[in-house]
């Protein structure tokens, strides 16, 4: 298994304007499901064949959060979201790349640029492939959501040994009535329950960042305490 590690220089934090960030990367050519799972449990995130985690000098606001699937019960409002999507077609498949995907990705990020002042990047086919398709091996999938045969949401996930790692989700803002972002996560939870998996790894919760603070609303959940290397056996998550 070829592995190359490197770090970025300090840069402006994408989540907190008054902070600086530094990222550690691992490039793993052919990552196994087991190694992926062990990295995710230790606070890493996968994009393509790259794994990353923050190693910021003066900040520890990025907290890895996971939902406890076996204890999770849908609320009344979440059941309403499911009912609104009774005719939404959901397909679980390996990651795809098409004009439809790229158009939807761009439309979502243009909307977020206007709504939340996100910094927008124009992704080429190759860049999308490198981030969301490459390296899916035997664990990477996408949940594709269709309304009247139109692709309206894509949720990229890894199905691992003890849970589902939620990588990235984007949707058509014209279909806001269907709460597609929330519906996609509820689908992840349903899949995990059916597969007897314990966790949904939601990535980083940042309390002071509106785009990431919502994750704490999904309870019960646990937060990773500290950072651990692969060779360290003790990984502590706490409610």
From Swiss-Prot:
Entry keyword Cytoplasm: yes
Localization, UniProt: Cytoplasm
- GO MF terms, alphabetically ordered: arginyl-tRNA--protein transferase activity; leucyl-tRNA--protein transferase activity
Q: What range does the record give for the signal peptide?
A: none
GO BP: any one term:
ubiquitin-dependent protein catabolic process via the N-end rule pathway
Tell me which UniProt keywords the record has, alphabetically.
Acyltransferase, Cytoplasm, Transferase
Give the Enzyme Commission number. Answer: 2.3.2.29
Question: InterPro entries under this entry?
Answer: Acyl_CoA_acyltransferase (IPR016181), Asp_Glu_LeuTrfase (IPR017138), N-end_Aminoacyl_Trfase (IPR030700), N-end_Aminoacyl_Trfase_C (IPR007472), N-end_Aminoacyl_Trfase_N (IPR007471)
Reaction(s) the record says it catalyses? N-terminal L-glutamyl-[protein] + L-leucyl-tRNA(Leu) = N-terminal L-leucyl-L-glutamyl-[protein] + tRNA(Leu) + H(+); N-terminal L-aspartyl-[protein] + L-leucyl-tRNA(Leu) = N-terminal L-leucyl-L-aspartyl-[protein] + tRNA(Leu) + H(+)
What EC class is this? transferase
* UniProt GO cellular component terms: cytoplasm
Q: Which family does it belong to?
A: Belongs to the R-transferase family. Bpt subfamily.
User: What functional role does this protein have?
Assistant: Functions in the N-end rule pathway of protein degradation where it conjugates Leu from its aminoacyl-tRNA to the N-termini of proteins containing an N-terminal aspartate or glutamate.
Q: Which PANTHER family match?
A: ARGININE-TRNA-PROTEIN TRANSFERASE 1, ARGINYL-TRNA--PROTEIN TRANSFERASE 1
Q: Which NCBIfam families match?
A: PRK01305.2-1, PRK01305.2-3
The protein, known as: Aspartate/glutamate leucyltransferase
Q: Which organism is it from?
A: Campylobacter jejuni subsp. jejuni serotype O:23/36 (strain 81-176)
Gene behind the chain: bpt
